[in-house]
From Swiss-Prot:
This is Homoserine O-acetyltransferase. It comes from the Bacteria. It comes from Bifidobacterium adolescentis (strain ATCC 15703 / DSM 20083 / NCTC 11814 / E194a). Pathway: Amino-acid biosynthesis; L-methionine biosynthesis via de novo pathway; O-acetyl-L-homoserine from L-homoserine: step 1/1. The record marks S192 as: Important for substrate specificity. The record marks E111 as: Important for acyl-CoA specificity.
Length: 344
């Protein structure tokens, strides 16, 4: 939420430089308030689990948020009852005339496939086209981020030599970025993926900026320069036991070469309680994003198409470091701290 300060207060310039929302009295009196409207495109197999994880984060904001759920029409979910989908989900056709402050696009366990092999790829692109004129800001997660980066900006998806699985350090690129304001200089991010993105494609695209980066996990959080699109390559929304459940599931299947989740169990012992070491940054990211949307979205959402065409949406404040140039020279990753939490 913004703070209201006296007109002409000298601290205003400092607060502005640190990306802190402050309103002088005349601005506050003109401000109109309404609930934020979000729609979640849930591509994950376990719909209810993902709903719970995302709503848990969204609920941490003091803002009132209205949430709708979207599904694809070209792919039939098999891990949730049809009744649940009928009761709580609609396809794009039901939303095409609606406007939203935010869209959340989840990941999906299809990163090993070429985009064209995903049965809902064409529909995915249609949803992104709709969002470009009907949504103020979009948060993409994992495969959703890979797909959007490829479709929007030509960033190539690359298969990894082995699955990236565990909790990995990310280095903050700018302490005063809107989305990462309040982050520690090193934050932890869960990953469970078989693919990544081409960092060179990101570095050479003037529209993109890397907000957090890790030596092993690569870019963890990316945004457009106007923050209208945010791409999280990891899973900050994951609960404490999600990685453990994935590991146990694959072990019970008798799969060979099941990767062990790195930096997750104390002393790498799966009999011990896993560490929930990313929760604070997950909550802070989502609070920051919702707060930024609240401060900058138009009161009348039907103005989004015109404002976007005129390039008057968003903030257009770039981070202080050159996009694609990870700022790691000042930091040394911790290692062998007794828990093995910061390796990699």
């Amino acid at each position: 939420m913004p703070i209201k300060i006296p007109s002409g207060l000298p601290a205003r310039d400092i607060l502005d430089s640190e990306r802190i929302f402050a309103l002088e009295k005349p601005e506050a009196e003109r401000q109109r308030v309404r609930p934020l409207k979000l729609v979640i495109l849930n591509l994950m197999p376990k719909k209810i689990e993902t709903e719970t994880q995302l709503l848990r984060l969204i609920s941490k904001s003091p803002l009132q948020v209205e949430v709708d759920f979207m599904k694809t029409s070209t792919h039939e979910a098999t891990h949730v009852s049809a009744d649940h989908l009928v009761k709580f989900y609609e396809t794009l056709d039901a939303f095409k005339d609606n406007y939203y402050d935010g869209l959340v696009v989840t990941g999906a366990p299809v990163e090993h496939l070429d985009f064209e092999q995903v049965d809902y790829w064409d529909e995915f692109k249609q949803i992104l086209d709709w969002a470009s004129t009907h949504v103020f800001s979009t948060m993409y997660l994992c495969w959703g981020a890979m797909g959007a980066l490829n479709y929007r900006y030509g960033v190539r998806k690359e298969l990894l030599p082995e699955k990236l699985f565990g909790v990995f350090p990310q280095y903050l690129q700018d302490e005063y970025c809107f989305l990462t304001n309040g982050f520690d200089e090193i934050c932890l991010q869960p990953h469970s993926r078989l693919a990544g993105v081409n960092e060179g494609d990101i570095a050479h695209n003037p529209e993109l900026q890397v907000l957090t980066w890790g030596p092993k996990s690569g870019p963890g959080l990316i945004a457009t320069r106007d923050f209208s699109e945010v791409f999280a390559l990891g899973h900050w929304e994951y609960g404490k036991y999600t990685l453990a459940e994935e590991y146990e599931r694959d072990m019970k299947k008798g799969m060979t070469n099941v990767p062990f989740p790195e930096n997750y169990f104390p002393h790498d012992d799966p009999k011990l309680e896993p560490l929930f070491a990313w929760r604070a940054h997950a909550n802070l990211l989502w609070r920051n994003w919702l707060n930024w949307v609240y401060q900058t979205t138009p009161y009348d959402l039907s103005e989004v198409p015109q404002l976007r065409e005129e390039k008057r949406l968003g903030t257009d404040r770039s981070i202080r470091h050159e996009p694609g140039s990870p700022r790691v020279d000042a930091f040394t990753p911790f290692s062998h701290d007794g828990y093995g939490v910061i390796r990699g």
